[in-house]
């Protein structure tokens, strides 16, 4: 059973240690130390941007072997990694297993070749609707049921504190080009997402169809989208409508 008093002392100590740090290098150094205290050799902090849908921008920082991180990025494994994809539908920690990687055998086999044999991944939603994940790994000693709850709680605290700290420091991993929509643009996008044509939207909003199309063009430029349908899909994915 977890020692709640010890856990609260640890959490208070971690926040106190992070509070005066003013650079990402110091933040990641504290994270690495805590990961080792938790019994793991490696960590990776990843951020998956929401768009584009087919090849979302994914950035990873951590102590995984450098060659493996480069390979992971080059192969765009972030788009198929089940430990990351789990975070799109759940905020629960996943422990790595053969069954988890059943549809991503090449990724799983390569990771183990690099000594990333035992691990866990925990996701959270970051600002701008980004997905942040914290993974920890070691080369042996399976995660026991006794360890699992302790790992889950500490990873949750670590990733929330880390993400907030990096956001405050405006770290590039967590920065995305903000899309600002006017009230009228948001209205038009909402109706577009509901399948309404420009003519129908014009009638609903009591404006001309040319005005609707004018707003559509401006919206598409803001999202760098080739058509209004994709612009509406991007806006929905980013939580703007």
Swiss-Prot record:
Subcellular locations according to the entry: Cytoplasm
Keyword Cytoplasm: yes
Keywords per UniProt: Activator, Cytoplasm, DNA-binding, Quorum sensing, Repressor, Transcription, Transcription regulation
SUPFAM superfamilies: C-terminal effector domain of the bipartite response regulators, Pheromone-binding domain of LuxR-like quorum-sensing transcription factors
All copies of domain HTH luxR-type, residue ranges: 174-239
The UniProt record lists the keyword Repressor: yes
Induction entry: The rhlR promoter region contains four different transcription start sites, two of which are included in the upstream gene (rhlB) coding region. The rhlR gene is subject to a complex transcriptional regulation. Expression is dependent on LasR and on different regulatory proteins such as Vfr and RhlR itself, and also on the alternative sigma factor sigma(54). Expression is partially LasR-independent under certain culture conditions and is strongly influenced by environmental factors.
Superkingdom assignment: Bacteria
A GO BP annotation: quorum sensing
Annotated GO CC locations: cytoplasm; protein-DNA complex
Segments of the chain annotated as binding DNA: 198-217
Family matches, as InterPro entries: Sig_transdc_resp-reg_C-effctor, TF_LuxR_autoind-bd_dom, TF_LuxR_autoind-bd_dom_sf, Tscrpt_reg_LuxR_C, WH-like_DNA-bd_sf
Annotated knockout phenotype: Disruption mutant shows defects in the production of rhamnolipids, elastase and pyocyanine. It also exhibits reduced LasA protease activity and casein-degrading activity.
GO molecular function, one term: DNA-binding transcription activator activity
Mechanisms controlling activity: Activated by interaction with the autoinducer signal molecule N-butanoyl-L-homoserine lactone (C4-HSL or BHL), the product of the RhlI synthase. Is also activated by binding to rosmarinic acid (RA), a homoserine lactone mimic produced by plants, which induces a broad quorum sensing response, including the induction of all major quorum sensing controlled virulence factors. Rosmarinic acid secretion may be a plant defense mechanism to stimulate a premature quorum sensing response.
UniProt cross-references to Gene3D superfamilies, sorted A to Z: Transcription factor LuxR-like, autoinducer-binding domain, Winged helix-like DNA-binding domain superfamily/Winged helix DNA-binding domain
Similarity annotation: Belongs to the autoinducer-regulated transcriptional regulatory protein family.
Binding partners and assembly: Homodimer in the absence of any acyl-L-homoserine lactone. The presence of the autoinducer C4-HSL has no significant effect on dimerization whereas N-(3-oxododecanoyl)-L-homoserine lactone (3O-C12-HSL), the LasR inducer, is able to dissociate the RhlR homodimers into monomers.
Function: Quorum-sensing regulator that controls the expression of multiple virulence factors in response to extracellular signaling molecules called autoinducers. Involved, among others, in the transcriptional regulation of genes that are responsible for rhamnolipid surfactant biosynthesis. Acts by binding to a specific sequence in the rhlAB regulatory region, both in the presence and in the absence of its autoinducer. In the former case it activates transcription of the promoter, whereas in the latter it acts as a transcriptional repressor.
Protein name from the UniProt record: HTH-type quorum-sensing regulator RhlR
Source organism per UniProt: Pseudomonas aeruginosa (strain ATCC 15692 / DSM 22644 / CIP 104116 / JCM 14847 / LMG 12228 / 1C / PRS 101 / PAO1)
């Amino acid at each position: 059973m977890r020692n709640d008093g010890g856990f609260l002392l640890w959490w208070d100590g971690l926040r106190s240690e992070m509070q005066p740090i003013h650079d990402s290098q110091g933040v990641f150094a504290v994270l690495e130390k805590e990961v080792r205290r938790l019994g793991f050799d490696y960590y990776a902090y990843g951020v998956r941007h929401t768009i584009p849908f087919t090849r979302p921008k994914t950035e990873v920082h951590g102590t995984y072997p450098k060659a493996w991180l480069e390979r992971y990025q080059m192969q765009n494994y972030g788009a198929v990694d089940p430990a990351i994809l789990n975070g799109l539908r759940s905020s629960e920690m996943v422990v790595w297993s053969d069954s988890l990687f059943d549809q991503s055998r090449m990724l799983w086999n390569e990771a183990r070749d690099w000594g990333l044999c035992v691990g866990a991944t925990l996701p959270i939603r970051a600002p701008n609707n980004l997905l942040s994940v914290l993974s920890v790994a070691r080369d042996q000693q399976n995660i026991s049921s006794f360890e699992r709850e302790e790992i889950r709680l500490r990873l949750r605290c670590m990733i929330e504190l880390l993400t907030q700290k990096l956001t405050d420091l405006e770290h590039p991993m967590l920065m995305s080009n903000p899309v600002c929509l006017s009230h009228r643009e948001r209205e038009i996008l909402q109706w577009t997402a509901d399948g309404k044509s420009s003519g129908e939207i014009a009638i609903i909003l009591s404006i001309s169809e040319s005005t609707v199309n004018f707003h559509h063009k401006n919206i598409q430029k803001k999202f760098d989208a080739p058509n209004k349908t994709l612009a509406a899909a991007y806006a929905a994915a980013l939580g703007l409508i």
